[in-house]
Design a protein with these regions (language model features):
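Metal-dependent nucleotidyltransferase catalytic core
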Residues: 8-10, 19, 58-89
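Catalytic metal-binding acidic patch
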Residues: 39, 44-63
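Short connector loops at helix/strand junctions that flank enzyme active sites
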Residues: 30, 47-51, 77
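Short hydrophobic/aromatic patches at helix-to-coil boundaries
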Residues: 100-106
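Helical scaffold of the NTase/Pol beta-like nucleotidyltransferase catalytic core
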Residues: 1-35
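Short, charged recognition helix plus adjacent turn
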Residues: 93-97
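Conserved beta-strand core positions
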Residues: 35, 52-54, 82
Length: 106
């Protein structure tokens, strides 16, 4: 059984990279692929109260149930609040910055 992350802080980028195979398998179980980290964790500036910003691709459009189930499964595994967004769901004014800073978990 995998040890849970400290609930007082989001996992570091290095921790997420070590967990990448598990995280990508989890995303695939809900129809997602290509998980990428952006935001404060990707920039190395996460604080104890920060959430974890993840970008995920879905071939086609995920159902609300698929999307929420993946979000909740990631939160349960990592024991941290996850802000999960899809590429298609990114607001146009944020898309370029987020895609530029997003770090693949592969």
């Amino acid at each position: 059984m995998m040890e849970r992350m400290n609930p007082q802080r989001p996992p570091s980028l290095d921790e997420l990279k070590r967990l990448a195979p598990t995280l990508q398998s989890l995303a695939a179980a809900y129809g997602g692929r290509e998980l990428r980290v952006f935001g404060s964790v990707a920039r190395g500036g996460a604080q104890p109260a920060s959430d974890l910003d993840l970008l995920v691709d879905f071939p086609g459009s995920p159902s609300l149930e698929q999307f929420m189930d993946l979000k909740l499964a990631l939160e349960d595994l990592l024991n941290v609040r996850v802000d999960l967004v899809t590429r298609k769901g990114l607001r146009a004014e944020l898309r370029e910055r987020i895609e530029r800073e997003a770090v693949p978990l592969a």
